[in-house]
From Swiss-Prot:
Any Gene Ontology CC annotation: cytosol
Quaternary organization: Component of the RNA degradosome, which is a multiprotein complex involved in RNA processing and mRNA degradation.
The organism's place on the tree of life at top rank: Bacteria
SMART domains to which the protein is assigned, alphabetical: DEXDc (SM00487), HELICc (SM00490)
Enzyme's top EC category: hydrolase
Family: Belongs to the DEAD box helicase family. RhlB subfamily.
Function text: DEAD-box RNA helicase involved in RNA degradation. Has RNA-dependent ATPase activity and unwinds double-stranded RNA.
Chain ranges of the Helicase C-terminal domain: 231-391
Organism: Xylella fastidiosa (strain Temecula1 / ATCC 700964)
Stated name of the protein: ATP-dependent RNA helicase RhlB
Stretches the record annotates as Disordered: 424-454
Main location: cytoplasm
PROSITE patterns linked to this entry: DEAD_ATP_HELICASE (PS00039), HELICASE_ATP_BIND_1 (PS51192), HELICASE_CTER (PS51194), Q_MOTIF (PS51195)
Length: 543
């Protein structure tokens, strides 16, 4: 991305269809960005292109102009069936596919072309019916498109004139390469169609794909002074793990009213960060793989409109999202991959705007920093963690978000993992119960009349042992999720809470025994505890 995102080259200087040129002008597009100025002369002549450009440079508009101009300037086959689209645009994520569709409709919606948006997570039959009715341009994610291709009568690519692969490097990262090859093999021969490939990096594997399925593609690179734009002001803090939330709240309180994205490495901890922000009075949305597609679209729309102040996300949102006006990007966790760092901070400072990227390098993820700095070819300025920053400034009263809880729906599996990890650190959370060695999360009851947080306990119940009297059921309260083997010392936070209730408590035929009582009653009890301990340690080691 250049510091001057627009060139002096006007769209009217190209031989574009008059209706397309009118649509571009009406949508506010008059001057080309550098990648558009490089792409259009070659692509409008019918050549294949392998283009490299960072996010936010205008490459989406570049290939949309080429696609729409080709379809308007040349008539389709007379015997083309409704299920035969003339153009195909592939995107790695649903969010990117939606954004491409919105951009296409913005300037091409009134040009007589039919656009079909195909992606997973929404009504399958409705999309299938849309394809059967016919579309000129199909914008799709690979998985859902393959589902329809295998049905034969829904969609066919036999007469497709132009194909676009956007974010090709991301296709590899997400494991879509087999799907892409499956789709490309169903297109016409490469000499009888035009193919445009765009990627943030033209790595060896991306170029290998280009040369295998494209017709002598011309390699185009939008030159940049650095991997990251100089308009992104980067800085990094080195907080302790327990300082990250206070530091985040302190920094946010000093930048009120700014549209902000916070990136977390795992969806397990997304909810914890989001809830901390929510309890601090911020209007927060969660974007991760566990949030249903319709809710994701709603969250993005509300964030775009300013109804949400902060979007907490995993890397599912790091690429392809065109959200205007993001002022701050926080890397709550440093990413493992240096490219992910570039794509994360690329959410801000788009198309010449300024932005800030603030990263936290805690002891868990600081190891990624040398690779990131080597990749971006610069040292990230270090800022000190001070007591003043750890104390958030006072905020005005929280306004209602008007739409219920915005923290998002995290899957039960993610909750189990979070509980287990906090359990291991000696901080019990939630109220899982144990049945046959499996930890599960149970809903608790509010202790304050419904207005406060749910307070529950973490409990582990052993199986009924056949060698013990049927009226005796041992119940052991476990404070940390780790049961020590017999004869070993138990740590301060790791131990068995032995509870006993009198038979006079009113529970007929049910006696709660202590560990010593059960051991005395049954010689097999130590092995049962050992099995439980091994089971829990095995569960924790998975995460």
């Amino acid at each position: 991305m250049s510091d001057k995102p627009l060139t002096n080259l006007n769209f009217s200087s190209f031989d574009l269809h008059p209706a397309l040129l009118t649509g571009l002008t009406r949508a506010g597009f008059t001057l080309c960005t550098p990648i558009q100025a490089l792409t259009l002369p070659v692509a409008l002549a019918g050549r294949d292109i392998a283009g490299q450009a960072q996010t936010g440079t205008g490459k989406t508009l570049a290939f949309l102009v080429v696609v729409v101009n080709r379809l308007l300037s040349s008539p389709g086959l007379v015997n083309r069936n409704p299920e035969d689209p003339r153009a195909l645009i592939l995107a790695p994520t649903r969010e990117l596919a939606i954004q491409i569709y919105n951009d296409a409709v913005k300037f091409g919606g009134n040009l007589g072309l039919r656009f079909a948006l195909i992606y997973g997570g929404v009504d399958y039959d409705r999309q299938r019916e849309m394809l059967r009715k016919g579309a000129d341009v199909v914008i799709a994610t690979p998985g859902r498109l393959i589902d329809y291709l295998k049905q034969h009568e829904v969609v066919s690519l036999r007469v497709c004139e132009i194909c676009v692969l956007d974010e090709a490097d991301r296709m590899f990262d997400l494991g879509f390469i087999k799907d892409i090859r499956f789709i490309l093999r169903r297109l016409p021969e490469r000499c009888s169609r035009q193919t445009l490939l765009f990627s943030a990096t033209l790595s060896h594997r991306v170029l290998e794909l280009a040369y295998e399925y494209m017709n002598e593609p011309e390699k185009l690179v939008a030159e940049t002074e650095s991997v990251t734009t100089t308009r992104v002001r980067q800085r990094i803090y080195f907080p302790a793990e327990e300082e990250k939330i206070p530091l985040l709240l302190g920094l946010l309180s000093r930048n009120e009213g700014m549209r902000t994205m916070v990136f977390v490495n795992t969806k397990v901890f997304v909810e914890g960060v989001a809830r901390a922000l929510d309890e601090a009075g911020y209007r927060v949305g969660v974007l991760s793989g566990d949030v249903p597609q319709r809710k994701r679209e709603t969250l993005l729309n509300r964030f775009q409109k300013g109804q949400l102040e902060i979007l907490v996300a995993t890397d599912v949102a790091a690429r392809g999202l065109h959200i205007d006006g993001v002022n701050y990007v926080y890397n709550y966790d440093l990413p493992f991959d240096a490219e992910d760092y570039v794509h994360r901070i690329g959410r801000t400072a788009r198309l010449g705007a300024d932005g800030d990227a603030i990263s936290f390098a805690c002891e868990r993820y600081a190891m990624s920093l040398p690779d990131i700095e080597a990749y971006i070819e610069q040292k990230i300025p270090v800022a000190a963690v001070t007591a003043e920053l750890l104390a958030p400034l006072s905020r005005p009263g929280r306004a209602s978000n008007g739409n219920g809880d915005t923290v998002g729906d995290i899957s039960p599996h993610s909750r189990d993992v979070l509980v287990a990890q906090e359990w291991r650190r000696g901080k019990p959370r939630g109220s899982p119960g144990e049945r046959d060695g499996r930890i599960r999360v149970c809903k608790g009851t509010r202790s304050d009349g419904g207005g406060g947080r749910r307070r529950t306990k973490f409990r582990l119940e052993t199986e009924r042992d056949s060698s013990v009297d049927g009226a005796v059921t041992p119940v052991f309260g476990v404070s940390t999720g780790i049961v020590s083997a017999p004869g070993k010392e138990v740590g301060r936070n790791i131990g068995l809470r032995r509870r006993s209730r009198s038979m006079d408590s009113g529970e007929s035929g049910h006696v709660v025994a202590t560990a010593d009582q059960v051991a005395a009653k049954s010689g097999s009890q130590p092995s049962l505890l050992g099995r439980i301990g091994r089971r829990i340690r095995s569960l924790l080691s998975m995460f």
